[in-house]
UniProtKB/Swiss-Prot annotation:
Protein name per Swiss-Prot or TrEMBL: Ribosomal RNA small subunit methyltransferase G
InterPro entries (UniProt xref): rRNA_ssu_MeTfrase_G, SAM-dependent_MTases_sf
Source organism of this protein record: Pseudomonas paraeruginosa (strain DSM 24068 / PA7)
GO molecular function: rRNA (guanine-N7-)-methyltransferase activity
Residues binding S-adenosyl-L-methionine: G81, M86, V132, E133, R147
Subcellular location: Cytoplasm
Catalytic activity: guanosine(527) in 16S rRNA + S-adenosyl-L-methionine = N(7)-methylguanosine(527) in 16S rRNA + S-adenosyl-L-homocysteine
């Protein structure tokens, strides 16, 4: 993990403490190993516009961890438009008892995610290269999460077939999406909203939890 320094480890530990997320030594090691892979592969694969490793800790790792206190929707999860693996990879590390499926239509990104699965030995992680509309899992997911993926309307419409009455949809947003909420499909409702304070991140962060009404 040559690109990852003690400073990054300390920043991760402090931020997790602020978020109230418990990290044992193994989970810290895995998160930092993931960060090292993200730094290495980003040079060729353009996984994220964030280039500074210091920013990656706050804007990717800690941002992903910020939803952990609200991610209580069962053991079978889908990360839609996972990209470089946020928040799916950190969630898979934090919850080894849960099954995490990472879905993305970009082949370069799914190749990277497959490498992460192999190198970090994440047996609970599945990587799927597909468009969300074409993805047909065997059973509904308990939780469906997206981070900077689409509008709430598109998120609901494109993933409706992937969940059921008990599913929670978690949409990670920046500023509060008032206009997007006005366009939310009639068969979805907002179950909860949370303003998130992510250590080291400027600007607003919000998490919206959606449920089906029919």
């Amino acid at each position: 993990m040559s690109a990852v320094t003690r400073h990054h480890a300390d920043e991760l530990a402090r931020g997790a403490d602020e978020l109230g997320v418990a990290l044992d030594a193994e989970k810290k090691h895995q998160l930092l190993a993931y960060l090292a892979l993200l730094i290495k592969w980003n040079k060729a694969y353009n996984l994220t516009a964030v280039r500074d490793p210091d920013e990656m800790v706050s804007r990717h790792l800690l941002d992903s961890l910020s939803i952990v206190p609200h991610a209580e929707a069962g053991d079978n999860w889908l990360d839609v438009g996972s990209g470089g693996g946020m928040p799916g990879v950190p969630l898979a590390i934090l919850f080894p008892e849960r099954r995490l499926t990472l879905l993305d239509s970009n082949g370069k990104k799914t190749r990277f995610l497959t490498q992460v699965k192999l190198e970090l030995k994440l047996a609970n992680l599945d990587v799927v290269h597909s468009r969300v509309e074409a993805f047909r899992p065997e059973s509904p997911f308990d939780g469906i999460v997206s981070r900077a993926f689409s509008s709430l309307e598109d998120f609901a419409n494109w993933t409706r077939h992937l969940g059921g009455q008990e599913t929670r949809w978690l949409a990670m947003k920046g500023v509060h999406p008032n206009e997007e909420l006005a366009a939310l499909p009639e068969d979805f409702r907002v179950e909860a909203e949370h303003a998130l304070a992510v250590p080291g991140c400027q600007g607003q962060r919000h998490l919206l939890i959606l449920r089906r009404t029919a």
